[in-house]
Amino acid sequence: MVYRPTAHEFDDLPKIEFIDSCPYQVFLEQYLKPCVPVLIGPKLTAQWKANTTWITSKGDPNILHSYILPDKPCTSRDNTSGNSLLNDNDIKNFIRSYAERIVNNEDKNVFLDSLLLSPNYEYLEENYGTIPVPLAYCNEKDRYGSQRRETVPLKSALHELRDEQVQLQCRQAPSNQALKSLYAKDMHLFRHLDPADFPYSTPDIFADDWLNAYVIDCESDDFRFAYLGSHLTTTGLHTDVYASHSFSVNLCGVKCWLFIDPKDLQTIASLYDDQQLPSWITKDDLFRGPLVNHRHLIKILFQYPGQTVFVPSGWYHQVLNIGTTLSINHNWCNASCILQMYTALKEQYEVSAESLKDLLEDGIVTKDRFSQVVTEVVEANYGWCWRRFWGMIKHQLKRRDAILHSSEYFSKWPIQPEFLPPLSWEYSILKNILLNDEPGSTFDSGSPPSSIVTIFKSLGDFKE
């Protein structure tokens, strides 16, 4: 079925498909391979421990519940939400329309109860309070024009976020303009956790993850995050790191997403005076401004508690939090987006080399040193480099080889064979980057290292 929220003038924006449950083969063929976003129902993560420990209905009620009660005014005045995408009437219409379309009374009551859920501040502080986290002030800008951030212990962030939630609930602030609009983003709460203490398990449909398998096994790092934002906080229009995929599981609060298909990026950028994508798409953009005749290219999605969003590689998206929201997110990758990641990294090297070419032409550095400088700049600005990219590929090929031969290969990111795509398909993708160029002697160039090519060719005997 298709998820179709209605909120008057937003009705003509295309919607992201909703599916109640998603078997692996369905996900692989209909969404992962073609890189199509999808919203998945609560069954996918119903068994998560975080559903009972990270959130609660006994604490301060979430402000978004006021949008559903006819005898209760909304917290913010109409058109003062400060986010410039949805005013309070828009939000009210979306949420009430969704509730009205739930036929089963029991299901409707479950949904209404979910709007009361809030973060379990005491539990989060007790278990993760000393971990340093990035805290964004969404109403403030740094010198580069981005949201101002600082790193604080999670305990401090929780205290400030809870204060904001209480102020909104008590009607002490008419909008987020009077508050700090705090959003704790990219929180690494799981990096050093013992597996027995994990509050969730990665859904099987997302388990074929080369990125986390590599950085967890080889770098003691991860791309697993938690996000905690107050009412009307935002993440601007962007695409995910390294051209990876992501998924986001919403535990409490509501998220409004806008999506742009990669094939429509140039068209949309051309509609703006500077020929660039905006940092935030506004309601005026959609209905009176540059997008008024092209808003059919913008897809909208409301994500409610318990639901999971799959964001494919290359899809630009922005997010507005409604109520206090708490989510668990991964960046991840596999064969379905490895060509996009390869191309994106190659472009980073080309752009950096072009900007630094005077160093080479003026004889300031040697050719070998120039390559090192380019790599240093790419890694500093982009956070990724050929050495790590090829290391990830090699790690994945070794894991695949071990599965094929039923041999021992220890990994902190194990995967069951039934949640892997056909090797023949994976092989057909990888050969585009592993067999088209002459192998290199090191891991530091865009040419595939010969040691990786050797492993890859050996898998060719099994690909059928």
Swiss-Prot record:
Q: Which residues form the JmjC domain?
A: 182-349
- GO CC annotation terms, alphabetical: chromatin; cytoplasm; cytosol; nucleus
Question: Please, one GO biological process term?
Answer: positive regulation of translational termination
Q: Which domain of life is it from?
A: Eukaryota
One family name in Pfam for this protein: JmjC
Q: What Gene Ontology molecular function terms does this protein carry?
A: 2-oxoglutarate-dependent dioxygenase activity; peptidyl-lysine 4-dioxygenase activity; sequence-specific DNA binding
List the SMART domains hit by this protein, alphabetically: JmjC (SM00558)
Which PANTHER family does the UniProt record give?
2-OXOGLUTARATE AND IRON-DEPENDENT OXYGENASE JMJD4, ARGININE DEMETHYLASE AND LYSYL-HYDROXYLASE JMJD
Protein's name in the database? JmjC domain-containing protein 1
What is the species listed in this Swiss-Prot or TrEMBL entry? Schizosaccharomyces pombe (strain 972 / ATCC 24843) (Fission yeast)
The upper taxonomy is:
Eukaryota, Fungi, Dikarya, Ascomycota, Taphrinomycotina
Q: Which gene encodes it?
A: jmj1
